């Protein structure tokens, strides 16, 4: 039996990953992390979606220690989430240092326990928000370290790594879940479901990708299929 664990926030990217994983694996588990995030409404959204989509199990792990260590606008109410700035340079204040290091490591431990062969994460390098822990180089390096440390080949899969947001919408549509991802996921840094606040970087990436996809579905769908190998 093929098993996978999805690092699941209830947002656009991880929900799209879950939708695909359910088609590719016999048994899919979801792991969601409570780190005291500003947008912690995502935890309830993740619970609802994991149940609705048919995950075998959904584990919510308390990692609030991260909130004490990692200073970010997503972990401190006193630091405002900035509006999207297209010309901004450097790492944004929404970056939570160590978050994906912790999440992927804990997800791998869970995968070890449930005998899953893969940990799936929705990180992406093509239009990411400037986070160093969304890079392919990082994921591969951590995957190597974790596999060595556990003496077990647990594969980190990144199905969205080389597709952009428009193509991620196309992937959701490919599996017949475009409306669900648009209306029932939570991507917004300010914790607003669906189309979100419309001002933060997460909402901007999501909206621009959707508009691009809806404006030229055939071209974007074809590009997504070519990059992912789907028919």
UniProtKB/Swiss-Prot annotation:
Family, as annotated: Belongs to the QueC family.
Cysteine disulfide links: none
Cofactor remark from the record: Binds 1 zinc ion per subunit.
EC number: 6.3.4.20
Keyword rRNA processing: no
Required co-factors: Zn(2+)
Protein name: 7-cyano-7-deazaguanine synthase
Organism whose genome encodes this protein: Escherichia coli (strain SMS-3-5 / SECEC)
Keywords in alphabetical order: ATP-binding, Ligase, Metal-binding, Nucleotide-binding, Queuosine biosynthesis, Zinc
Pfam families attached to this UniProt entry: QueC
Catalytic reaction equation(s): 7-carboxy-7-deazaguanine + NH4(+) + ATP = 7-cyano-7-deazaguanine + ADP + phosphate + H2O + H(+)
Summary of the function given for this chain in its UniProt record: Catalyzes the ATP-dependent conversion of 7-carboxy-7-deazaguanine (CDG) to 7-cyano-7-deazaguanine (preQ(0)).
Annotated residues for binding of ATP: 8-18
Lineage of the organism: Bacteria, Pseudomonadati, Pseudomonadota, Gammaproteobacteria, Enterobacterales
Functional pathway: Purine metabolism; 7-cyano-7-deazaguanine biosynthesis
Annotated GO MF terms: ATP binding; ligase activity, forming carbon-nitrogen bonds; zinc ion binding
Highest taxon listed in the record's lineage: Bacteria
């Amino acid at each position: 039996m093929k098993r996978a664990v999805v690092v699941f926030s209830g947002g656009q990217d991880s929900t799209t990953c879950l939708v695909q994983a359910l088609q590719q694996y016999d048994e899919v588990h979801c792991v969601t992390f409570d780190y005291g995030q500003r947008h912690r409404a995502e935890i309830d959204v993740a619970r609802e979606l994991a149940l609705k989509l048919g995950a075998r199990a959904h584990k919510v792990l308390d990692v609030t220690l991260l909130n004490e260590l990692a200073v970010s606008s997503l972990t401190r109410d006193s630091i405002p989430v900035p509006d999207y700035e297209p010309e901004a340079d450097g790492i944004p204040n929404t970056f939570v240092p160590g978050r994906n290091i912790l999440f992927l490591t804990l997800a791998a431990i869970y995968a070890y326990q449930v005998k899953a062969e893969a940990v799936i994460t929705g990180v992406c390098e093509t239009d990411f928000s400037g986070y160093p822990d969304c890079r392919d180089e990082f994921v591969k390096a951590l995957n190597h370290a974790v596999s060595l440390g556990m003496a077990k080949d647990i594969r980190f899969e990144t199905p969205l790594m080389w597709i952009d947001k428009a193509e991620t919408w196309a992937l959701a549509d490919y599996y017949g879940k475009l409306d669900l991802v648009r209306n029932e996921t939570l991507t917004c840094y300010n914790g607003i479901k669906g189309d979100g606040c419309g001002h933060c970087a997460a909402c901007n990436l999501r909206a621009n990708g959707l508009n691009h996809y809806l404006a030229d579905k055939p071209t974007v769908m074809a590009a997504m299929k070519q990059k992912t190998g789907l028919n």
